[in-house]
Amino acid sequence: MVIMSEFSAVPSGTGQGQQKPLRVGFYDVERTLGKGNFAVVKLARHRVTKTQVAIKIIDKTRLDSSNLEKIYREVQLMKLLNHPNIIKLYQVMETKDMLYIVTEFAKNGEMFDYLTSNGHLSENEARQKFWQILSAVEYCHNHHIVHRDLKTENLLLDSNMDIKLADFGFGNFYKPGEPLSTWCGSPPYAAPEVFEGKEYEGPQLDVWSLGVVLYVLVCGSLPFDGPNLPTLRQRVLEGRFRIPFFMSQDCETLIRRMLVVDPAKRITIAQIRQHRWMQADPTLLQQDDPAFDMQGYTSNLGDYNEQVLGIMQALGIDRQRTIESLQNSSYNHFAAIYYLLLERLKEHRSAQPSSRPTPAPTRQPQLRSSDLSSLEVPQEILPCDPFRPSLLCPQPQALAQSVLQAEIDCDLHSSLQPLLFPLDTNCSGVFRHRSISPSSLLDTAISEEARQGPSLEEEQEVQEPLPGSTGRRHTLAEVSTHFSPLNPPCIIVSSSATASPSEGTSSDSCLPFSASEGPAGLGSGLATPGLLGTSSPVRLASPFLGSQSATPVLQTQAGLGTAVLPPVSFQEGRRASDTSLTQGLKAFRQQLRKNARTKGFLGLNKIKGLARQVCQSSVRTPRGGMSTFHTPAPSSGLQGCTTSNREGRSLLEEVLHQQRLLQLQHHSSTAAASSGCQQGPQLSPVPYVLAPCDSLLVSGIPLLPTPLLQAGMSPVASAAHLLDTHLHISAGPVALPTGPLPQCLTRLSPGCDPAGLPQGDCEMEDLTSGQRGTFVLVQ
């Protein structure tokens, strides 16, 4: 791997102890943007235009001939693509061991990181971004180029938050009717035909990936994911995915038409443009003009921007050499300066939309510094005051010598030598009054490398397991297949052809949500959704934040110190209304349980303690010095009534049954006393208490009226009467009534064991076995 130090040491003879930035050609390297298995990406600034660029530095010594051919093919594809939503290629430099690819720098990074930080997009925002993505992909297809690796990591955002399609490492030429066979791409975005190892049509492959991208933009999560590659493969082949409740019907229809398992039934790019969801915003239709302004980009047709050429000529750069470089697609220093100045001009125009462009100045063999004020582009387009005097100097030779002298200042000895662009005699041709060399090392080595043919598609690839980490976050095949053993193996999807269980259409059924498998809004990152900085409350983070997945989408940045938003909650149904009935039933049940518990449950428990009286199982000292009652054996009537089997009855039925028995017994005893038996003192009903044990006073339980005490009495009516019973609880000691007990009370001796009262009924609230002594049995 190429490792460059950020600064090069200044020779000690200069007397300066500081370090100056590393220079590569006409670029000052500022910092590292990323590193891969065989390349490193640096952020640099052009020394003439002061424009920031991204330089991809590739170590050719670590590439075999097949992978090096892929690199050359990527360069050739980027030379053919000039679109506002595609990363622009500025310059290509090559040495014996190194390859330098200078491209446009997207200031706001990847769409992947944006979703990680802000959550999923609204459908209006997603529609705007998807129009730009669709325009770029359609432009590629019109030039017979297929991308084959469309994903949010390869969608960059410039300073205006516009989409820039990048990374054509898996791109290739295609011809209609001639299928491709290379299995490449990223697992979550790969089409079923790639997993099956079949030949495929390039545009249909990109349409599937576009459907996954649109799903990620709207939902913040992946439609297909899994803990390992076989599980992911099975889900992709089934074509089943979840639909969140907040997705509109039109958006769902569009995604389902793109994510069709059968490639022949999949929607096309032209049909996507005409879909109702895409046509919902008329303003986007006006902005999406296929005949966009390509002035200055169609250099091979002789359509050049005269203002940019005039500025370059005023700076002392040879005009004829610049035109030749543009016509030959050399992408050397001349073309780089031209394209960079053209970008600065467009940025200036977009910053001042009200200003009208003035007519281009008349061609002159040479422009003086005073003539620069007549151009439309002001001097702010060439910033940096320390360098401006040399740029506007009327002496072209002075500029040439200053730039070349600065180039010589580069430290060419030590380990940094292969990283720096070599100084050769061809560089002198950049400026006017210099001889024009017929050939140059910078552009002849990468002019005709890309060749169409089956050899590019029939590459021998070995099946390897999914690595733990790769240069790309979602990649099936890397160009580092035949690198040194220190490099991770490439990722290849199994080539075994498996028949799809559902050919033709995507399944409408929804998978059950699983926190470990499904999107749990982008663990991710997808919420990730680490993915998290400031965001509106309505945006949800990526659902797969912290989830176990074979593809860490929206997970990598989950722990960057930002607040994680809650994951998107997917319902079983397709629409939000599908869950309203279930939620209503749940709320009704909760309210019903609440109302049922608010009345009678405390009293019912106490009634159970009074009605299910028990005998003494073991004599222990009771709490509070409870007095002992000596009672005779219970009457036979009570025994006969309570010997029936009560197994299988509920607690409430037992209480009601015993309560009715007590009331019947009391009624019969009262009638006998009034007919001539021994008359006892007429006492008012006294509370039936278990006083000393719990110091609780339970007021008299009213007896049911006689008409209700019939065999056919409804248990529901008795339950309702019991639930209305009022209990008076007192914490203080209660004096027991003196005098003879009423006939309804019977004293039980400590050793008695009344028949009909099973031992299991010897349990009372707040009364242990040590507190059981003499009890009062309510008859």
From Swiss-Prot:
Write down the superkingdom of origin.
Eukaryota
List of catalytic residues: 149 (proton acceptor)
Keyword 4Fe-4S in annotation: no
Point out residues bearing the modification Phosphoserine.
Answer: 186, 577
According to its UniProt record, the EC number is 2.7.11.1
Q: Where is the composition biased (Polar residues)?
A: 363-373, 628-641
Q: What is the tissue specificity?
A: Expressed in lung, skin, ovary, heart and stomach. No expression in brain, liver or adult skeletal muscle but is present in skeletal muscle progenitor cells of the somite beginning at 9.5 dpc. Present at 8.0 dpc in the monolayer of presumptive myocardial cells but rapidly down-regulated at 8.5 dpc upon primitive ventricle formation, although still present in myocardial cells that will populate the primitive atrium and bulbus cordis. At 9.5 dpc expression is down-regulated in the primitive atrium but observed in the sinus venosus and truncus arteriosus.
Keyword vocabulary terms for this entry: ATP-binding, Biological rhythms, Cell cycle, Cytoplasm, Developmental protein, Differentiation, Kinase, Magnesium, Metal-binding, Nucleotide-binding, Nucleus, Phosphoprotein, Serine/threonine-protein kinase, Transferase, Tumor suppressor
Q: Where is the Protein kinase domain?
A: 27-278
Quote the subcellular location field of this record: Cytoplasm; Nucleus
Extract the coiled-coil ranges from the record: none
State the family it belongs to. Belongs to the protein kinase superfamily. CAMK Ser/Thr protein kinase family. AMPK subfamily.
UniProt domain comment: The RK-rich region determines the subcellular location.
The name under which this protein is listed is: Serine/threonine-protein kinase SIK1
Lineage of this protein's species? Eukaryota, Metazoa, Chordata, Craniata, Vertebrata
| Name of the coding gene | Sik1
